[in-house]
Amino acid sequence: QPLQDMANADCIVIEGSNMAECHPVGFQWVVEAKKRGARIIHVDPRYTRTSAFANRHIGIRGGTDVVLLGAVINYLLDNDLYFHDYVVAYTNAPMIISEDYQDTEDLDGLFSGYDPETGKYVTDSWQYVQKPEGASWNVERDETLEHPNSVFQILKRHYARYTPEVVEETCGIAQEDFYYLAESIARNSTPDRTTCFAYALGFTQHTLGAQFIRTAAILQLLTGNVGRPGSGIMALRGHASIQGSTDIPTLFHSLPGYLPMPSVDKQSWPEYVDGIRNES
């Protein structure tokens, strides 16, 4: 979704970014959203111009974002504040995972399938339970979300460890601020209201940066904030021209849509497409 769509949001969470100063042109859409009555929350270790503009600045200990977002997920699940119809219709939450799967709470911090020799996971136990051929869905689903091996229930068990108390101890965030953030997201993630999540390098430049982004994506999917006006996740990059260069793009090695340039060894369209598939 384009940055302009932020103007349609009812709540905007900016985490790990001083958007007001690093993306001054794009920030105009945050200003427009606030004029409409949107709530702006800035989560960042520093107090910056973005913090001054926000309705609330929540200081966080650097590198602990995954704990904060994990606790918000747990809060939404525990209090039935997720967008049920959206989750059932548009996510893999109802799908059933193999009985062989074990989570980190079962294996002392590791998922099933870990190979200590290679340091990688063999993901056979992570697969969906398949339905017989000819069924309307090719995998088993439980739209009540109550099956113990559904993705939804696995998610609930995994994030149960993240509590407001853990957030306070790990992130240095007062419980009052945590509840303000969680309630703001919940109240503005309904059939007629949306929340937008924006991040930049303060969020990603960590050894766990990819996990931070995954957690934000899980949060936005649980609340129905993907594919609707004023929703989504905005990856702001470090400063304005980098985002534009990759989106348009003006970089020498990529085509619009983040497609790689053809190479000399790809002499036909099928070879080019197959090369993209193999690289991804």
What function would you assign to each model-found segment?
Residues 89-94, 184-185, 200-202, 232-243:
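A glycine-rich phosphate-binding loop feature that marks nucleotide/adenosyl-phosphate handling sites
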Residues 5-6, 23, 33, 43, ...:
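Active-site-proximal structural scaffolding
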Residues 1-25, 29-30, 36-38, 42, ...:
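Extended redox/cofactor-interaction regions of prokaryotic respiratory oxidoreductases
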Residues 28-30, 56-60, 73-76, 211-216, ...:
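Short secondary-structure boundary/capping segments
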Residues 48-191:
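Long, well-ordered, tryptophan-enriched scaffold segments
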Residues 15, 29, 33-36, 71, ...:
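Generic, well-ordered alpha-helical scaffold segments in large soluble proteins
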Residues 20-23, 48-51, 66, 94-95, ...:
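Flexible loop/turn segments at secondary-structure boundaries
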Residues 166-173, 199-207, 236-240:
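Conserved short loop/turn motifs at secondary-structure junctions
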